[in-house]
Amino acid sequence: MTIRSVVLGCGSYLPQRVVTNAELASRIETSDDWIVQRTGIRERHVAAEGEFTSHLAINAARAALAAADVDPQSIDLIVLGTSTPDNTFPATAVAVQDGLGIHHGAAFDLQAVCSGFVYALATADNFLRSGSFKRALVIGAETFSRILDWNDRTTCVLFGDGAGALVLDAQRQDGTSADRGVLTTHLRSDGRHKAKLYVDGGPSSTQTVGHLRMEGREVFKHAVGMITDVIVDAFEATGLSAETIDWFVPHQANKRIIDASAHKLHIAPEKVVLTVDRHGNTSAASIPLALDVAVKDGRIKKGDVVLLEAMGGGFTWGSALVRW
């Protein structure tokens, strides 16, 4: 017998305002065709003035708790993946904890940029499996619109705001790949690439927030190889394969990266969950947002094996296999 982190429910939240490619094309030198052909993105959501990362996260968490049909007071761990916190400190996770009326247990932020949700999931899973906590909220939430240079057409068209969450419950299972819950997680990073995708500000360096900067070609060049390698690690750890998984829910950064990764791994296109067209790249929020879409539309069902992967600034990257 072993302890697994079983998914009880998921939820998401998107700001009301939708920004289409056409709206961006009216402000900067770009076009809907240019954006769609290179990224697959058609629109993205942008947080309203006064709407913070914590607000998005609280709404997503409430939706996940409702879907799981559990009392918020049963949560004793909150791990929030974000690169756009409300404040330098305290952690945005404690604002979420307070917003949910939870005043016990532990809550903290985890920063791995677009890999943030996979890192948060792996962290919560290890805490639950160790017996330190019993029930966790794992959240990815971002307001990337606040760190974009809206005059840089190579980056401002890519990102959006949003939040998604999972409720994980520690349950005893048989210890095989037939178990429900998180089956394996694999995390990687390589700081030699830190200048290829970064924000040019921070409290220690410039005392400013800064803007996102990216060498797009370099990111694309490394992405597919890194993503596929860490997925192979997950397959080898569990004995599962591209043929035996039910769904592939990748970080929604760019449709070309997703398509190339799926092709290299021989994952059938019909198994790939794509939401990048409607959400853009929401960084740490993208995977739980996509999961919630696929659960709500009936694709992901209890017992399905779901493969997750992400890559972000640093570079950081990771994978997870979860039986729903």
UniProtKB/Swiss-Prot annotation:
Known role: Catalyzes the condensation reaction of fatty acid synthesis by the addition to an acyl acceptor of two carbons from malonyl-ACP. Catalyzes the first condensation reaction which initiates fatty acid synthesis and may therefore play a role in governing the total rate of fatty acid production. Possesses both acetoacetyl-ACP synthase and acetyl transacylase activities. Its substrate specificity determines the biosynthesis of branched-chain and/or straight-chain of fatty acids.
The record's note on its domains: The last Arg residue of the ACP-binding site is essential for the weak association between ACP/AcpP and FabH.
PANTHER family linked: 3-OXOACYL-[ACYL-CARRIER-PROTEIN] SYNTHASE, BETA-KETOACYL-[ACYL-CARRIER-PROTEIN] SYNTHASE III, CHLOROPLASTIC
Keywords noted in UniProt: Acyltransferase, Cytoplasm, Fatty acid biosynthesis, Fatty acid metabolism, Lipid biosynthesis, Lipid metabolism, Multifunctional enzyme, Transferase
GO MF annotation terms: 3-oxoacyl-[acyl-carrier-protein] synthase activity; beta-ketoacyl-acyl-carrier-protein synthase III activity
Residues of the active site: C114, H251, N281
Family assignment from sequence similarity: Belongs to the thiolase-like superfamily. FabH family.
Enzyme kind, highest EC tier: transferase
Reactions listed under catalytic activity: malonyl-[ACP] + acetyl-CoA + H(+) = 3-oxobutanoyl-[ACP] + CO2 + CoA
Biological process terms in GO annotation: fatty acid biosynthetic process
Functional pathway: Lipid metabolism; fatty acid biosynthesis
Chief localisation class: cytoplasm
Subunit record text: Homodimer.
Enzyme nomenclature, EC number: 2.3.1.180
Superkingdom, taxonomy of origin: Bacteria
Gene name as annotated: fabH
Annotated segments matching region ACP-binding: 252-256
The protein's name: Beta-ketoacyl-[acyl-carrier-protein] synthase III
Cellular component terms per the entry's GO annotation: cytoplasm
InterPro entries the record matches: ACP_syn_III_C, ACP_syn_III_N, FabH, Thiolase-like
Intracellular or extracellular location(s): Cytoplasm
